[in-house]
């Protein structure tokens, strides 16, 4: 089967190409990509090329399909995974595989899987690491956004507090506390504000900063002080 994809060959060397996918192996899955959101990490990949830690260098000989926030539909399933996945099933993906201690990830490290493609082959390690998920919602773009949203949620869960005289980490933000979000009016920052307002743990006060007043003004239009007040939160 032919696919059309954007592959990286080196620093700022991105090429939209059409090429043949290899025959499907018994432990692989053929899929169609429907949506892929763009991450600044892909920009970093383009700027660094072979120096990026997730790349299997050299890219000039091993070009990788870019894009790691994607969602789509399964077309064909190898026999190994036929009991778990079916043709027609919608999927989302967790690209941070952590496979055998490596940093390999779809969108950085593989020749036949990435979000900026029409058709892809999902390799065995994605399923082995339980990083391929059935997606049951209607809008594919929401499946693409599951990866960046997981980064936002993970950042909140990684915060911790300690008590005087104790080294025990109390994980997560503090209910009824004060929360500062620095430089947080870009796409991920807006998501962080939204999660702070509507997530399970609510701060009493959220202070948002940025160096660009125009971006702050736009953020205030998208997420108003009044909407936060309805949730019992002072948004500054």
Feature names for model-found ranges:
Residues 4, 28-30, 177-179:
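Residues that mark the start of a beta-strand
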Residues 6-14:
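Extracellular beta-rich ligand/substrate-recognition surface
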Residues 22-37, 51-100, 113-114, 133:
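Glycine-rich beta-strand-centered segment in the early N-terminal region that forms part
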Residues 44-52:
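Short Gly/aromatic-enriched secondary-structure transition segments
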Residues 77, 148, 183-187:
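Glycine-rich Rossmann-fold phosphate-binding loop(s) that bind the pyrophosphate
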Residues 97-176:
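NAD(P)H dinucleotide-binding glycine-rich loop of Rossmann-like/cofactor-binding domains
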Residues 176, 182, 193-236:
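Adenosine-nucleotide cofactor-binding segment
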Residues 187-188, 215:
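Hydrophobic/small residue at the entry helix of a nucleotide-binding pocket
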């Amino acid at each position: 089967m032919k696919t059309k994809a954007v592959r990286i060959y080196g620093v700022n060397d991105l090429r939209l190409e059409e090429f043949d996918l290899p025959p499907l192996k018994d432990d692989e899955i053929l899929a169609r990509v429907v949506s892929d959101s763009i991450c600044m990490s892909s920009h970093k990949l383009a700027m660094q090329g072979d120096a990026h830690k997730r790349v299997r260098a050299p890219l000039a000989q091993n070009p990788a399909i870019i894009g790691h926030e994607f969602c789509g539909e399964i077309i064909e399933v190898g026999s190994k995974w036929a009991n778990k996945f079916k043709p027609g099933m919608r999927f989302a993906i967790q690209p941070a595989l952590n496979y055998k201690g490596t940093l390999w990830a779809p969108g950085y490290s593989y020749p036949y899987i990435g979000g900026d493609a029409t058709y892809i082959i999902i390799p065995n390690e994605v399923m082995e690491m339980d990083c391929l998920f059935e997606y049951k919602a209607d809008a594919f773009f929401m499946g693409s956004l599951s990866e960046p949203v997981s980064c936002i949620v993970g950042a909140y869960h990684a915060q911790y507090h300690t008590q005087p005289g104790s080294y025990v980490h109390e994980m997560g933000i503090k209910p009824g506390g004060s929360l500062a979000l620095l430089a947080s009016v870009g796409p991920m920052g807006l998501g962080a504000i939204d999660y702070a307002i509507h997530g399970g743990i609510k701060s009493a006060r959220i202070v948002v900063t940025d160096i660009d007043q125009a971006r702050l003004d736009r953020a205030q239009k998208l997420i108003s002080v009044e909407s936060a007040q309805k949730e019992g939160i002072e948004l500054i």
